[in-house]
């Protein structure tokens, strides 16, 4: 259903532009510039023209993926220090970095010796460093303004996704590989392990005879470390927006790769078309258009491959109302979550959002789009239950998938082969 869309008056837009120019030009030294964009959510549904660059990147050339060579052209973004700080590591179960991996060959450490990227007996995981960044975000009419800076400019700049239960972290570690549950019941991010039917599945799918829903996935994450979190929430919102910033497009599959969004086969013996976690070369990003290959964004196959839906209990849909957890509080009742005031009643591709402080944007149903317009990703809704969010997409959903795709149609206990989970680790908190 299309609702009335509010467009700001010209005088308001001119005042906003004046404040944007003042902010981005005068406040910071050049070594820590503000990078910014405005997404014209309602007035332009073309994913390749609705993003306007502002600030230090006003005249930048965006990044672009060569789908044939699978190589990223960094455009004007190659020297961004935040992007350079995104490196692959092996870390202990509590988020301390043990050593750095060769960014172009994960089977090697940075010093050239063999790594533990495929060693399930290693006491830790293969993860990717996401350095803290500050974000300012607001709406003017249906234009969404987003600013990023590596230092806190003022109180409006928040470390969205880096606040863990009230403690701001210097970095977060995102999974390089889809979550798998090992023989000790621990959630892992290790190459050479299956995610489908170890970190997902109903009782008949799994040799243990145990259905793996949200509670079971959380238990596996917590068994590895009490610091462990689901890969979702505010940080994924921040990373999705950075993808838009880097590519100057809201069609992230077209910009970064289509992953494994169309590999499904109706055969449990073949893991329903999913694949075992595999080391993918090519550096920080790897993209393809065949819809049948592991891809990666920020060294993470989970972000780029769309093979299995990822449980994200930091967003719930309670009888049609979106509730969120900005600081990774885990509460499947939603009683302690923030009420966004946003209602969703039906499935759809949504072009507009509402900005939620400390969390990022959530979809609104004011304007419906498609797999080729707006944010290009689909949202499934059941407004009659308490639903737990899933993110990214699965290998049976094709162009419905993407970093803005969500399933808000299943309860926490819903266990299915395609509903998996991966772990997120915060940097150890300062004493």
List where the protein language model places each region.
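Short, low-complexity N-terminal tether/leader segments at secretion or assembly junctions of large
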Residues: 1-26
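Extracytoplasmic, non-cytosolic globular domains
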Residues: 294-320
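Short aromatic-cysteine micro-motif
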Residues: 117, 121-124, 151-304
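Eukaryotic short linear interaction motifs
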Residues: 136-138, 181-182, 238, 309-310, ...
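C-terminal, surface-exposed recognition/capping segments
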Residues: 35-43, 237, 258-273, 279-281, ...
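A short, polar/charged loop-to-alpha-helix boundary motif
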Residues: 318-329
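Eukaryotic intrinsically disordered and solvent-exposed regulatory patches
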Residues: 114, 286, 407-408
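Extended N-terminal export/anchoring regions of large proteins
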Residues: 25-184, 224-230, 234
């Amino acid at each position: 259903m299309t609702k009335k869309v509010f467009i700001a008056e010209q005088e308001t837009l001119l005042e906003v532009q004046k404040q944007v120019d003042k902010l981005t030009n005068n406040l910071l030294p050049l070594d820590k510039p503000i990078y910014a964009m405005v997404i014209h959510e309602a007035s332009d549904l073309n994913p390749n023209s609705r993003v306007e660059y502002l600030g230090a990147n006003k005249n930048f050339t965006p990044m672009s993926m060569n789908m044939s060579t699978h190589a990223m052209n960094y455009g004007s973004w190659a020297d961004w220090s935040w992007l350079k700080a995104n490196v692959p590591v092996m870390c202990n179960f509590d988020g301390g970095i043990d050593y750095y991996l060769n960014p172009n060959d994960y089977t090697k450490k940075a010093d050239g010796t063999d790594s533990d990227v495929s060693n399930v007996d290693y006491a830790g995981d293969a993860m990717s460093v996401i350095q803290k960044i500050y974000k300012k975000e607001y709406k003017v009419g249906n234009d969404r303004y987003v600013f990023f800076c590596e230092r806190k400019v003022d109180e409006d700049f928040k470390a969205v996704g880096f606040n863990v239960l009230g403690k701001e972290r210097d970095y977060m570690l995102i999974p390089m590989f889809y979550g798998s549950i090992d023989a000790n019941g621990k959630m892992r991010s290790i190459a050479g392990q299956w995610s489908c039917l170890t970190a997902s599945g109903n009782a008949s799918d799994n040799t243990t005879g145990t259905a793996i829903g949200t509670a079971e996935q959380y238990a596996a994450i917590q068994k590895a470390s009490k610091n462990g979190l689901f890969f979702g929430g505010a940080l994924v919102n921040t990373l999705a927006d950075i993808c838009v910033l880097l590519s100057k497009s809201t069609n992230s599959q077209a910009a970064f790769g289509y992953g494994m969004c169309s590999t499904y086969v109706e055969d449990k013996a073949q893991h329903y078309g999913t694949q075992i976690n595999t080391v993918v070369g090519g550096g920080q990003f790897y993209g393809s258009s065949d819809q049948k290959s592991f891809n990666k964004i920020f060294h993470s196959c989970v972000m780029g491959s769309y093979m299995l839906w990822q449980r994200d209990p930091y967003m719930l849909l309670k009888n049609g109302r979106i509730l969120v957890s900005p600081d990774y509080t885990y509460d499947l009742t939603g009683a302690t979550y923030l009420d966004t005031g946003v209602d969703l009643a039906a499935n759809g591709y949504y072009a507009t959002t509402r900005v939620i402080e400390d969390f990022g944007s959530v979809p609104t149903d004011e304007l419906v789009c498609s797999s080729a317009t707006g944010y290009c990703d689909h949202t499934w809704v059941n407004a009659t239950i308490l639903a737990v969010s899933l993110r990214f997409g699965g290998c049976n959903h094709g162009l419905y998938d993407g970093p803005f795709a969500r399933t808000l149609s299943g309860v926490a206990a819903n266990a299915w082969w395609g509903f998996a989970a991966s772990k997120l680790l915060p940097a150890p908190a300062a004493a």
